[in-house]
Amino acid sequence: MEALRSTKLTKVYRKSKGPALDSVDLEIEAGQIFTMLGRNGAGKTTFLRIASTQLMPTSGTVSVLGLDVVRDAKQLRERIAITPQEAETIYPLTPRDHVLLNLRMRGMPKEEAKRRAQEALDELELSDVSDMNSDWLSGGMKQRVIVAMAIQTDAELIFLDEPTIGLDPLNRRKVWEQLTKLKKSGRTIVLTTHYMDEAEALSDNLVIINRGKVVASGTPRSVKEAVTLRSTRVDVYDRFTQSELGRYGRVSTIAGRFRVLTDEGGARSLGEEALARSATISMSPVTLDDVFVDIVGEAEKGEESET
């Protein structure tokens, strides 16, 4: 069943040089975790704001849970939840107050809201600070409070804009566990992130957006397979110049070393040449991070060549 569909969705802000979203077509199936990747300003947050009825599109349409986000906005808001990127806790409320009040405002009975709030605080390890003034919390704790407010609702679809930003690796994984649990219960989650490991670990499907356009979409595996001609990553530490490495694949410079994305044959040839030169290299499979840099870099080069 379809949870979200956008058709030629376009958003142009006043005085902007170009569209924030440029004719974006997306389909998101119900009961999955769908991730949006892109650089800052790529259009991810704009998409989430339109899909969650917070922003009007310039043109095109979006339907969420079968409802039009413009025509049926009021009805839709009762069935979705969102954690916006700019969300903040409120003085002098406690973490418990935040979660409890949010659930009550959505119409949840008092006793059930109390139980749900406590569950969220326990699962995200906020119990010890549950009755503390939110202004005294660390940035990571505040972020977990914001996430707890969304995931404990009965919303059928939850939008999360960079939900784990500012969290340490352990607490990021705790949020991942909760999102996976929500998916297993049949809920749909649409999130944005800059963490490629997060996208790879959580996503059923993902999309890469660059300058308002979709430049890649599919499962994490299929998106990586989109660069099958460069399936191996070779880091070269010495004894080669960038131009010499160019014949093996695409070359970039990272932290003082060259990184070559190549195919298996190219990696084999480069390995033999490195052995002959006594060069230091390391090889590993291409990651989603490599693919993101590769795809976005290619898209931007293409746009530059057109201007």
Pin down the residues of each PLM region.
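Catalytic Walker B motif of ABC-type/P-loop ATPase nucleotide-binding domains
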Residues: I158-E162
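Short, charged/small-residue-rich alpha-helical element at the C-terminal edge
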Residues: L229-G302, T307
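A short, proline-enriched helix->beta-strand linker immediately N-terminal to the Walker B motif
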Residues: Q152-E156
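Conserved ABC ATPase signature
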Residues: P92, N133-G140
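ABC transporter nucleotide-binding domain
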Residues: W176-D263
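A short, flexible loop at the N-terminus of ABC-type nucleotide-binding domains that lies
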Residues: M1-S6, K11-S23, D72-A73
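Conserved ABC ATPase "signature" region
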Residues: L100, R104, E111-V129
